[in-house]
């Protein structure tokens, strides 16, 4: 080969070598970036650009696999104390837990086999709904617990009804500040049957299902250890099993709402071959869920807790043990009749318990779907809102199951309940509305619904009427007490809020077996005309304000607006309902 040709070949090879190195560098950078994203943000690859998880295309489960190289221990006093729920506008941030090294004695305990009933009588009592607890000299042993980075879930647009009159949290029902209560940690004393672990069908399933856009739920059958002090739920694997699962769950159905979930205790659900010794055996399933969040507002009491809890726990017919994180005593007292109907056992305060509870069946989190509804195609036993409506009527011993046709009762007048409000979205001409309704044949009842209302009394009032009406707000949640075929009329304030109103109360009412009417007010019926000129964009193009986010919508169209109903315009709605009641 000639020297000239050899030189050209060398230059060509050098160029190709540089290109190859550049290609390798680019590919390497891409792989490093992808690896970082997968490890640090496992959810990021599963959601579309607007941050919402598609209900139809969501994965069946999101598994976070990690190997545990070192045990650590979290002290119980590092968890935030359970407080009454507060609906807030600023994220207060959760305190970080402090990790401590695991002693040799604890390592020995973790690998030991449980001795049935050994520590049952000697276990320390904690605070649970029921009665005064007695303290013993033995403290429950804590599980070795590894701190992992929090799994950040995608932001989901969670619409919340936060009425001014429904945010008086931190109070008992009688308006007194919270007091310190002590409760007996004695879920089902005397249950000494050790859980069985042989369940091949459940062994094949992932422990948790993250596919639901609103709630993450973990369900296990077998040998399960719940250790509140370590905020952990352990599924005991056979020695031959190679499965390793670790999940991080906040058991409150507002998935993606970081403001709300910032106040919820995170629970680690994992498979394990070693665990702390059982100090308490239970023969009934466990359901673990949180209270702090948006509870304290009537709408969120139901859509975030009571409806999901009914969906999750009804199948057990009272034979179920509730373990509540972020306990709010005043709230559990308010809904004590509901808890008593769903469970025969005292509530366990998860954040103030030091025992190791052993179950054969456990559910962490609550089954939840769209706002204030049940998806019967996905719910256990195909439960529906008709079932929930029936459950609430029976729980509060309400007499009317169905609305009776007016023609069957001589001279009977249909009863109309008007939900009044005293702060925002008030009826400015309430007396005129009452007079008009009475003129066309209604017997009118006016009641105010707020956080301090006696739910038992209010439920009886609601159940006694044929029609309930009110401006969009949490008070309309009381429709759960209406008899079948009763009518709910929702007055929608100005501001393009028809779709929100339909989702929050229209769809749920119809799914409960109620008739539903929606009346959207006109510009002349809004008090906003006293604040803005008629040619203002708030009247000519109200939907343009929605781009500023829900907080702006709430402040502008809900908190600063009252309603002066045009009785001539609204009268045909009441007449139409009257005709339906006569059929």
UniProtKB/Swiss-Prot annotation:
Pathway: Glycan metabolism. It is found in: Golgi apparatus membrane. Signal peptide: none annotated. Keywords: Cell wall biogenesis/degradation, Glycoprotein, Glycosyltransferase, Golgi apparatus, Membrane, Signal-anchor, Transferase, Transmembrane, Transmembrane helix. The chain crosses the membrane at residues 22-42. Residues 1-21 are cytoplasmic. It is a single-pass type II membrane protein. GO terms for cellular component: Golgi membrane. The keyword Transferase applies. GO terms for molecular function: arabinosyltransferase activity; glycosyltransferase activity. Pfam families: Glyco_transf_61. GO terms for biological process: plant-type cell wall organization. Coiled coil: none annotated. Its EC number is 2.4.2.-. Glycosyltransferase involved in the arabinosylation of xylan, the major hemicellulose (non-cellulosic component) of primary and secondary walls of angiosperms. Possesses alpha-1,3-arabinosyltransferase activity, transferring an arabinofuranose residue to the xylan backbone. Belongs to the glycosyltransferase 61 family. This is Alpha-1,3-arabinosyltransferase XAT2.
